[in-house]
Design a protein with these regions (language model features):
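Alpha/beta-hydrolase-fold enzymes
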Residues: 2-95, 99, 225, 229, ...
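Low-complexity, highly charged intrinsically disordered N-terminal segments
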Residues: 62, 66-147, 175
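Short, surface-exposed "cap/lid" segments of acyl-processing enzymes
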Residues: 119-123, 129-200
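Alpha/beta-hydrolase active-site loop
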Residues: 205-226
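Gly/Ala-rich beta-loop-alpha elbow adjacent to hydrolase catalytic centers
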Residues: 235-240, 244
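Short beta-strand/loop motif that positions the catalytic acidic residue
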Residues: 378, 384-386, 390
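Short alpha-helix in the alpha/beta-hydrolase fold that links the catalytic acid
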Residues: 380, 394-403
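Catalytic histidine-centered segment of alpha/beta-hydrolase-like enzymes
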Residues: 392-395, 412, 416-431
Length: 444
């Protein structure tokens, strides 16, 4: 009897979902909320058990142990495929409901307004505490920045930094004392960088080929024209590393050295929460409804990985005296974290499908435009930089490139920090980036 009733209810729910998008949305929301709250409850329970058993040690160490227990349990639970699938179903039902109500155009108009407002703020945001630079006219919807220096470059080959499409480029030039740009500039490099700007709704049809082939090519050719160099070195950060890899595999004649910085290459090895959720998402529906992927959706995804830590980090940080420099750096990082730009729709669709779902890049089967990307074509010097504590791009997802390329001159640097720490930690600027600069100088 109970089994029969369960089957009847399942059939009823399925029928209602198919016939009514409201029910579909409601059921998917309830399912995801139930699984997500169960994960929070499980993590809280484990943290409480840790508290009961942590009788010795200082209050600070006990708190650290409890937080670690909560974080580890929550990450394990949130990385479960069933929860990831539930989240993807919920987002998909939400997208379909938005499409049904005609929110597509309303959303596009809202994000265009946001884009124009952001453009007004960009001169202020991009100049305070940044290394002086000038924007150079190029073909394409992006800016090529040339960082100014009072000293002439010591190395013949210029360096082009290829930024990510997810977050803003200025994490590499956050503050003078933790600026990768300034660090490498002091080591004698002539540095250029791509600023992809804030996309608008009519940019949604720009493709991966547009960025990885055309725009990077335009930037490379402009740098060559300005400097008189026949080649450039590329440094690709995160998804910018994907662009740099793709470009180098098809235009190696223009590239002297390739540096990859926290770049996802081999997703099958180990999936973080974000990578697992991303692989489960229906990118097609999201792009079809919204065009570009909203920046706030990206921010929300990062927040719900651990909402407790997100709330506690502020009172915990200010629980002890801080210098003005420390406070400035803290808020500079927070500003960058939530300054997520919308992701170009077609680029997102392509990367999610070919890299995160099918893992085609490392298999040499990824298609960009008319090209099949073969990493074995890359034979120039390559440096791969990873953070051993990176919870966005785990070490195993990046290290595979060492064996995937055809280069004989290649090096892996494993540094004990996280994704953002590679860019802004004092330890990285004292040890990591001088080592990167030394490696590059010997080949420039």
């Amino acid at each position: 009897m109970a089994l029969s009733l369960t089957l009847q209810m399942t059939a009823f729910n399925k029928k209602m979902e198919e016939s009514n998008p409201y029910f579909d949305y409601a059921f998917k929301w309830i399912d995801f909320a139930t699984k997500y709250n169960s994960a929070l409850l499980d993590a809280s329970s484990k943290a409480f058990e840790t508290f009961l058993s942590a009788r010795k040690g200082t209050a600070q160490n006990i708190e650290k142990t409890i937080r670690s227990s909560f974080d580890t349990t929550l990450r394990d639970d949130l990385n479960d495929d069933a929860l990831a699938s539930s989240m993807a179903d919920y987002v998909d039902s939400w997208a379909k409901l938005c499409d049904l109500f005609g929110y597509k155009q309303i959303t596009a108009n809202f994000y265009d307004f946001f884009s124009y407002a952001n453009i007004i703020l960009e001169p202020l945001r991009d100049n305070i505490n940044r290394t002086p630079s000038e924007a150079i006219d190029t073909k394409g919807r992006f800016d090529l920045l040339h960082y100014k220096s009072d000293l002439p470059p010591e190395h013949k080959t210029p360096l082009l930094v290829v930024g990510s499409l997810i977050n803003r480029y200025y994490i590499l030039d956050l503050l003078p004392n933790v600026s990768i740009i300034k660090n490498l500039q002091r080591q004698g490099f002539d540095i250029y960088a791509t600023d992809w700007g804030t996309p608008k709704s009519f940019d949604k049809d720009l493709t991966l080929e547009t960025y990885a082939e055309e725009y990077v090519e335009n930037a490379v050719e402009k740098v060559k024209e300005i400097t008189g160099s026949d080649k450039v070195s590329l440094l690709g950060y995160c998804w910018g590393g994907l662009f740099a890899l793709i470009y180098t595999s098809t235009h190696q004649e223009n590239v002297k050295n390739l540096i990859l910085h926290a770049t996802p290459i081999d997703i099958d090895k180990e999936k973080t929460i974000i990578e697992n959720w991303t692989a489960h998402l229906n990118a097609d529906d999201l792009v079809d409804v919204f065009g570009n992927i909203p920046g706030w959706l990206i921010n929300l995804t990062f927040l719900i990985r651990n909402p407790v830590e997100a709330m506690l980090k502020y009172p915990r940080y200010f629980s002890e005296p801080r210098s003005l420099d420390e406070i400035t750096q803290f808020f500079a990082i927070e500003t960058w974290l939530y300054d997520s730009r919308p992701i170009i729709g077609e680029v997102y669709r392509d990367i999610i499908d070919q890299v995160y779902r099918k893992n085609l890049l490392v298999k040499n089967k990824m298609i960009v435009g008319s090209d099949i990307i073969n990493l074995k074509n890359i034979t120039i010097p390559l440096l791969d930089i990873i953070g051993t504590k990176d919870d966005l791009v785990p070490p195993s997802a990046s290290t595979s490139v060492i064996n995937a390329v055809g280069s004989t001159d290649k090096k892996l640097i494993e540094f004990p920090t996280g994704h953002v720490g590679l860019c802004i930690s004092n330890m990285a600027h004292e040890k990591l980036w001088p080592e990167v600069g030394k490696w590059l100088a010997q080949r420039s």
